[in-house]
A protein has these predicted regions:
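A generic "structured core" feature
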Residues: 99, 137, 155, 159-161, ...
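Membrane-proximal basic amphipathic "stem/tether" segments
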Residues: 1-40
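C-terminal segments of enzyme domains that contribute to small-molecule binding surfaces
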Residues: 2-11, 113-148, 180-221
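Conserved catalytic-core motifs of eukaryotic protein kinase domains, centered on the activation segment
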Residues: 104-106, 170, 186-188
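Acidic, glycine-centered active-site loop in nucleotide-sugar glycosyltransferases
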Residues: 172, 177-180
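Catalytic-loop Lys-Pro-X-Asn motif of eukaryotic-like protein kinases
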Residues: 144, 162, 172
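Short-chain dehydrogenase/reductase
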Residues: 141, 159, 175-176
């Protein structure tokens, strides 16, 4: 764990927990297994499960990332407020240019500007509001340049098409697209979805996953 300490890794190094180079860490950063972090700025209360891969991204706030999830930059940012959370499940894929932000400017006052922070020396939270935590469940794929807004829950197995703006909850195994994003279709039939949900494969340990190669490589409808 990196606790309230600022580190800039100038050269590649490897420990039992993390492979890292050219990163900046600040805050309470916890690694629960091996991960690969490259060219990132990571600040706040952030936890990584095993085998997380993050490249060229910015993370700030209260964020948890499940095992085997990957986040790719450049220009990818995941941000929460001091009181909010972003929770990302296991086996998720987040592409370049994705913006995930748990809070917004307050716009029902005289100015939407951060006037409290920048003029009256108040904490940033004075100028922000949230519709709630952002929850991204297991096996979600978020395409390039998507925006995920405050209070959204993206359910297991969903796919978010590139360039979408997600302003409301996404149903399990849905494919959604657009601004604002709307459901295009389901990935699979209800029978297949029931089979996958019953299997709970995202909870399997790595040895069981490897023993069931055909389960994962099989095309489904």
């Amino acid at each position: 764990m990196i606790n309230n300490f600022f580190i800039c890794f100038k050269l590649f190094f490897e420990t039992g927990r993390v492979k890292s180079f050219f990163n900046i860490f600040r805050g309470k950063i916890k690694f629960y297994g091996k991960s690969i972090i490259q060219e990132c700025k990571i600040c706040g209360n952030i936890s990584f499960s095993e085998n997380v891969k993050i490249n060229n991204s910015f993370l700030s706030g209260n964020i948890s990332i499940g095992r085997f999830s990957s986040i790719n930059g450049p220009n990818t940012s995941i941000i929460s407020s001091e009181s909010g959370n972003v929770k990302i499940g296991s086996f998720c894929s987040i592409a370049r240019g994705v913006q995930i932000q748990e809070f917004n400017h307050k716009f029902n006052r005289t100015s939407s500007y951060y006037i409290g922070q920048n003029i009256f020396n108040k904490p940033r939270i004075f100028d922000t509001e949230s519709k709630g935590d952002i929850i991204i469940e297991d096996d979600v794929w978020i395409g390039a340049n998507c925006i995920i807004l405050s209070g959204v829950k993206i359910s297991r197995g969903a796919i978010i098409a590139a360039g979408s703006v997600v302003i409301k909850d996404v149903a399990p195994y849905s494919i959604i697209a657009g601004v604002p994003a709307k459901q295009i279709k389901k990935r699979f039939s209800e029978k297949t979805i029931e089979l996958l949900e019953k299997s709970k494969w995202w909870t399997w340990d790595i040895s069981k996953i490897k023993e069931n190669e055909q389960f994962f490589l099989k095309e489904r409808s």
